[in-house]
Amino acid sequence: MAAQRPLTIALVAGETSGDILGAGLIRALKARVPNARFVGVAGPRMQAEGCEAWYEMEELAVMGIVEVLGRLRRLLHIRADLTRRFTELKPDVFVGIDAPDFNITLEGNLKKQGIKTIHYVSPSVWAWRQKRVFKIGRSTHMVLAFLPFEKAFYDKFNVPCRFIGHTMADAMPLDPDKNAARDVLGIPHDAHCLALLPGSRGAEVEMLSADFLKTAQLLRQRYPDLEVVVPLVNAKRREQFEKIKAEVAPDLAVHLLDGMAREAMIASDAALLASGTAALECMLAKCPMVVGYRMKSFTFWLAKRLVKTEYVSLPNLLAGRELVKELLQEECEPQKLAEALLPLLANGKTSHAMHDTFRELHQQIRCNADEQAADAVLELAQ
């Protein structure tokens, strides 16, 4: 009598964030099904958990239109090869982790072959290009969503979706230790502290840094003891920021940090930041914030027509109201930014109310996402 085939899960991750999610999912599945087999496109973390890599994740990790066009033939070859090999393997479930442009078509190919498919991490269909939801519905048996309003969106279109909570919410404490973070950064416990996070992309740092620095100068006039911390994502962004600072605010003393954004947020009384994942992380760090964002006029004009949400920052989308101030385009200027930040630095009623709401929202999305994702995979595999 032939031995029963072990549970076989195929996965494709296209970037580092997907590799982290994939590794957490594999770990949770192995705890329940120790002999399960994992194959696909994997990064170093997934491979360390035992995933057999048919292709290295770096093959898919291309950014920007020019880079994608340059690699298009190779990407199409990989997708066709994976379709063929997964069809032959017939895994119990296929999990496409993020990388929607690559994975959703692959999921559709496999679903047609009778393979059960999951898309892990919803694209921002609720915000723009909403018609993508129909392709997602045709291509997948289940979407795993980090945020509750994403599930509500899919429910409207009868696309099966499971809210699993956010892995970042699982990783961060409900009550971070501000003084411990200040000790790490060398910030006095009794000083006022402001974090500036002008973004991770070059264009964001270029557009926002000068106004963020001028805002800090205005706030320093009100709070002479103000410590300013600026975490920068890499050496290139740091060099870019230093050049802008030398022109705009050469005399402003700041703590420039290599990475360490989370520590900076936890240590600070308030943060001024570009939108994006940083706003969610800042909320989970319980740091009151103001979102300031500017883009080229045509890009903003286009975005206003494409984006369907009332707010741009995740804390506001989660709260369903303007919990944090969003100052966009011409509103994103030093005087208005400083006015919005002043009550937060005062550590009074405004910042305490914001902190309490941040904690409530943290609890809402802290659901042990790795375990929830594993539940979804095993239920679909049955």
From Swiss-Prot:
Pathway stated in the Swiss-Prot or TrEMBL entry: Glycolipid biosynthesis; lipid IV(A) biosynthesis; lipid IV(A) from (3R)-3-hydroxytetradecanoyl-[acyl-carrier-protein] and UDP-N-acetyl-alpha-D-glucosamine: step 5/6
SUPFAM superfamilies, per database record: UDP-Glycosyltransferase/glycogen phosphorylase (SSF53756)
Gene Ontology terms: biological process: lipid A biosynthetic process
Alphabetized Pfam families for the sequence: LpxB
UniProt KW keywords: Glycosyltransferase, Lipid A biosynthesis, Lipid biosynthesis, Lipid metabolism, Transferase
EC main group: transferase
Organism domain of life: Bacteria
Known EC number: 2.4.1.182
GO cellular component, one term: membrane
Single annotated GO MF: lipid-A-disaccharide synthase activity
Keyword Transmembrane helix recorded: no
Reaction(s) catalysed by this chain's protein: 2-N,3-O-bis[(3R)-3-hydroxytetradecanoyl]-alpha-D-glucosaminyl 1-phosphate + UDP-2-N,3-O-bis[(3R)-3-hydroxytetradecanoyl]-alpha-D-glucosamine = lipid A disaccharide (E. coli) + UDP + H(+); a lipid X + a UDP-2-N,3-O-bis[(3R)-3-hydroxyacyl]-alpha-D-glucosamine = a lipid A disaccharide + UDP + H(+)
Keyword Transport set for record: no
Function: Condensation of UDP-2,3-diacylglucosamine and 2,3-diacylglucosamine-1-phosphate to form lipid A disaccharide, a precursor of lipid A, a phosphorylated glycolipid that anchors the lipopolysaccharide to the outer membrane of the cell.
Family: Belongs to the LpxB family.
UniProt xrefs under PANTHER family: LIPID-A-DISACCHARIDE SYNTHASE, LIPID-A-DISACCHARIDE SYNTHASE, MITOCHONDRIAL-RELATED
NCBIfam families: lpxB
Name listed for the protein in its UniProt record: Lipid-A-disaccharide synthase
Taxonomic source organism: Salmonella paratyphi A (strain AKU_12601)
The encoding gene: lpxB
